[in-house]
């Protein structure tokens, strides 16, 4: 049988290659390091953790923790290895990064069905089953080839994403639903500022601390010229925002009947109205600063952020246009994608993408139908989101409870709601796996800590 090709030896590619070999099929894993250097990597190991050593919260009533549990049940190599190399980190799953990557490298290099080739693939293979898992720093040559394959508008090279907040955390006594001049459907939540509120917000925004750029981002400042951070707009003058993204024209505050001094608008991100995007708030502020400053917006005092604003180098596909929820390309079903290049964020999401793409690559090789995970699971919700989101405004998304379908019976208390999401996800995963004849590993669930959840810990 012709080997399956996996391009990229990060978390997603490593997981994908393992799942293919686990299915008893030969796989060739291409990793360009150390022959071709990456601006962010420091070793030649597979699955090197280039940023934090943390896989996020461990508790099953947190979004990332639920994804950990799902992947443990599904037999993820990445999560199993992370569990073996844990270091103390409070409620987070953090690892000894050197031992973690070294074990994964040795595991794949010593597997009889895995061939690791240390060379760059400048072009997508024209035939065979292929998993693309090249990550946010895809090489220039392969990026150019991907642009030719997908079309110039369907591959991005940097994130310029605004924060997203949970709809239930927005104060609807202050924020009001309307469109400018009442044209068409009332599509935006509008947060009205008084002159005093705007002045305080503008001052805090100008003084807020920005996240430092990495060396390779600083050297390529053109990535940021097309989409100026909101804090840079603010520094151009006190009225720049008020005549730009915070302009109040065409809107009236229903509490006063008057036009506000300024207005911050939020646009619905999902069909259920659970997630709302701060329009025009692409930012490079530190995450703690974003929460502090953006909670000064009237109506967002208690806002729960599920994605922070980012601006950084990141190669990713316009997944809603290109990918199915099975992670297959719509126009070439034998080509699959996994990891950050699909528009998911975080180590655990990358492992989940590697699991699904690798599993489906093996199924395609055996003539079986590809899998689509239930959208009520965290993994399934992620892949459903990236394959169905609005393509014109698509930006990468981390695991969060806001992308899950609403519960049949609404639960007001956050801790109980998250626990209900978890219970439904794991139940539906078990039912689905049984129907698909997939073995699941037994899970030992941790307890839910309502106080920690309500506090946002």
Curated annotation (Swiss-Prot):
Subcellular compartments: Cytoplasm
E.C. number: 2.1.1.74
Principal place of residence: cytoplasm
UniProt xrefs under Pfam families: GIDA
Keyword Protease: no
Obligatory cofactor(s): FAD
Catalyzed reaction equations: uridine(54) in tRNA + (6R)-5,10-methylene-5,6,7,8-tetrahydrofolate + NADH + H(+) = 5-methyluridine(54) in tRNA + (6S)-5,6,7,8-tetrahydrofolate + NAD(+); uridine(54) in tRNA + (6R)-5,10-methylene-5,6,7,8-tetrahydrofolate + NADPH + H(+) = 5-methyluridine(54) in tRNA + (6S)-5,6,7,8-tetrahydrofolate + NADP(+)
PROSITE patterns (alphabetical): GIDA_2 (PS01281)
Binding site for FAD: 8-13
Chain segments annotated as coiled-coil in the UniProt record: none
Keywords tagged on the record: Cytoplasm, FAD, Flavoprotein, Methyltransferase, NAD, NADP, Transferase, tRNA processing
GO cellular component, one term: cytosol
GO molecular function annotations of the record: flavin adenine dinucleotide binding; tRNA (uracil(54)-C5)-methyltransferase activity, 5,10-methylenetetrahydrofolate-dependent
Domain of life of the organism encoding this protein: Bacteria
The keyword Chloroplast appears for this protein: no
Listed InterPro entries: FAD/NAD-bd_sf, MnmG-rel, MnmG-rel_CS, MnmG_N, TrmFO
GO annotation, biological process: tRNA methylation; tRNA wobble uridine modification
Name of the top EC class for this enzyme: transferase
SUPFAM superfamilies: FAD/NAD(P)-binding domain
NCBIfam families from the UniProt entry: gid_trmFO, PRK05335.1
Assigned protein family: Belongs to the MnmG family. TrmFO subfamily.
Function recorded in the entry: Catalyzes the folate-dependent formation of 5-methyl-uridine at position 54 (M-5-U54) in all tRNAs.
PANTHER family hit by this protein: GLUCOSE INHIBITED DIVISION PROTEIN A (PTHR11806), METHYLENETETRAHYDROFOLATE--TRNA-(URACIL-5-)-METHYLTRANSFERASE TRMFO (PTHR11806:SF2)
Protein name from the UniProt record: Methylenetetrahydrofolate--tRNA-(uracil-5-)-methyltransferase TrmFO
């Amino acid at each position: 049988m012709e080997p399956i090709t996996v391009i990229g030896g990060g978390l997603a590619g490593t997981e994908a290659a393992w799942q293919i070999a686990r299915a008893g099929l030969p796989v060739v894993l291409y990793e360009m390091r150390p022959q071709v250097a990456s601006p962010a990597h420091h070793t030649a190991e597979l699955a090197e953790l280039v940023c934090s050593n943390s896989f996020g919260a461990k508790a099953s009533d947190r979004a990332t923790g639920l994804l950990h549990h799902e992947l443990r049940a599904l037999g993820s190599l990445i999560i199993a290895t992370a569990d073996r190399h844990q270091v103390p980190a409070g409620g987070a799953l953090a690892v000894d990064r050197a031992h973690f990557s070294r074990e994964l490298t040795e595991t794949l290099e010593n597997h009889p069905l895995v061939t690791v080739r240390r060379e760059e693939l400048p072009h997508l293979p024209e035939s065979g089953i292929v998993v693309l898992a090249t990550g946010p720093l895809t090489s220039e040559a392969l990026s150019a080839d991907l642009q030719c394959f997908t079309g110039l508008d369907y591959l991005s090279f940097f994130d310029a994403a605004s924060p997203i907040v949970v709809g239930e955390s927005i104060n609807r006594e202050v924020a009001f639903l309307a469109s400018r001049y009442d044209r068409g459907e009332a599509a935006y939540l509008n947060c009205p500022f008084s002159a005093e509120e705007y002045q305080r917000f503008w001052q805090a925004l100008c003084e807020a601390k920005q996240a430092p750029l990495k060396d390779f981002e600083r050297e390529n400042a053109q990535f940021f010229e097309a989409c100026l951070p909101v804090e840079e707009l603010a520094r151009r003058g006190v009225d720049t925002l008020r005549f730009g993204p915070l302009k109040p024209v065409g809107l009236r505050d229903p509490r006063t009947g008057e036009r506000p001094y300024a207005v911050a608008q939020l646009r619905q991100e999902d069909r259920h109205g659970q997630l709302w995007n701060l329009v025009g708030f692409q930012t490079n502020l530190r995450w703690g600063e974003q929460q502090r400053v953006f909670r000064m917006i009237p109506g967002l005092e208690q806002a729960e952020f599920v994605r922070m604003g980012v601006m950084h180098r990141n190669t990713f596909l316009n997944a809603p246009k290109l990918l199915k929820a099975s992670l297959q390309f719509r126009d070439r079903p034998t080509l699959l994608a996994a990891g950050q290049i699909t528009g998911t964020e975080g180590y655990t999401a990358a492992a989940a993408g590697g699991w699904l793409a690798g599993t489906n690559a093996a199924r395609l090789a055996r003539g079986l139908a590809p899998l689509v995970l239930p959208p009520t699971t965290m993994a399934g919700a992620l892949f459903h989101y990236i394959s169905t989101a609005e393509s014109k405004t698509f930006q990468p998304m981390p695991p969060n409870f806001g992308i899950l379908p609403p519960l049949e019976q609404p639960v007001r208390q956050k801790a109980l709601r998250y626990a209900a999401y978890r219970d439904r996800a794991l139940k539906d995963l078990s039912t689905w796996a049984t129907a698909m004849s997939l073995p699941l590993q037994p899970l030992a669930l941790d307890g839910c800590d309502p106080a920690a959840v309500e506090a946002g810990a």
